Amino acid sequence: ESESMEAFRIKNGISAKRYLGSNGTETAGTVGYAVSNGTYDSKSFATTAQENAPHGISIKPDGTKLFVLGNGGDDVGEYTLSTAYDISTASFVDSFSVSTQLSLPRGLFFKPDGTKFYAVGTSTDKVFQYSMTTAWDVSTASYESKEFLVSSQETSPFGLSFKTDGTKLYVLGMTAKSVFQYTLSTAWDVSTASYDSVSYSVSSLGTLPVCVVFNSTGTEMYTTSADNAQFVRIHTLTTAWDVSTASHTGSLDTSGDVTASQIGGLVFANSGQKMYFSQQSNDTIYQYSTVSYTQALDLSTGTTF
């Protein structure tokens, strides 16, 4: 391997896909969360048979399972994808009711290892915590009797998200129209949450904000609003995971691809190379590609392009 090739790899921080010989081309790799350049995969899945008002959604990291929370059934539905990351191959497996805690469930978030999930809704203004004895299997789920009240900041919470290590919680709702930030003194335990006195307003982007999601590094945040539902809004954070440093930097308009009148939930998978959102008006999950390609190196000249 040549010295210039190694320097290229270090500079871009990504290992090459392949090497084609001394006179060939090295392709460095791909980058996810390229939301502004997102393209519809022409793939979707209708949840109508189980849930006619889908809101929060989550995807297992390996792309083989989908989870949908909605207020039609007040439960979390589990689906298997026979082809990883291909939403059109989903089939229903089981469900777990959250109706004892929530009558209007909205937001859903799964811990990255699949042993816990969290739900928020407008009926109680609380974030509820659940555990699964078998990871990613909602038939083994149970309520942990752990919750966190957010009504001092938001009385109509719709969306929630966590920092990847479980030490930060974020809640977005329709009343304050802001993303609120909390610290968990014990990671992934919502009963230990406290408000950071930090928030970020999205009111200028819509009056009915419903969803908040972060990229894996906390340097970008994505929101949706029910009254401007065709848009996925992009926000850049100059300090990772600190929403007080956020600013609106772009959008993805999905109106040319789907009739997005009521986006209810949003989630990324495959290192941010796939994006999915739920559509309440027609009970459907849509799939997008959100990937960009890095530079390639001409091995004969050392030129990148």
Model-derived features: positions:
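Polar, enzyme-active/binding microenvironments
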Residues: 2-305
